[in-house]
Amino acid sequence: MRVLFFVFGVLSLMSTVPPTRSFTSNDECPSEYYHCRLKCNADEHAIRYCADFSICCKLKIIQIDGQKKW
């Protein structure tokens, strides 16, 4: 009887916890500055996965220091 209550408790807990990824979420890259690819270029880094299991890539922001003044 305890095992039956334990199984029902686990099933009810699993039904109340929301799934980790919702089907209503937007799986596309958010703007024109992002691109879905299988591999990011050297000047890009991965943001998230797209709907077709490719990677959403974004350009890296590289700040170049100006000339150092003594």
Curated annotation (Swiss-Prot):
Protein keywords: Antibiotic, Antimicrobial, Defensin, Disulfide bond, Secreted, Signal
Keyword Disulfide bond belongs to the record: yes
A biological process term (GO) from this entry: innate immune response
Pfam families listed in its UniProt record: Defensin_beta_2
Disulfide bonds: 29-56, 36-50, 40-57
Any one annotated GO CC term: extracellular space
Signal peptide: 1-22
Keyword Isomerase: no
Location in the cell: Secreted
Function as written in the Swiss-Prot or TrEMBL entry: Has antibacterial activity.
Record-stated family: Belongs to the beta-defensin family.
Protein name: Beta-defensin 131B
Species assigned in the record: Homo sapiens (Human)
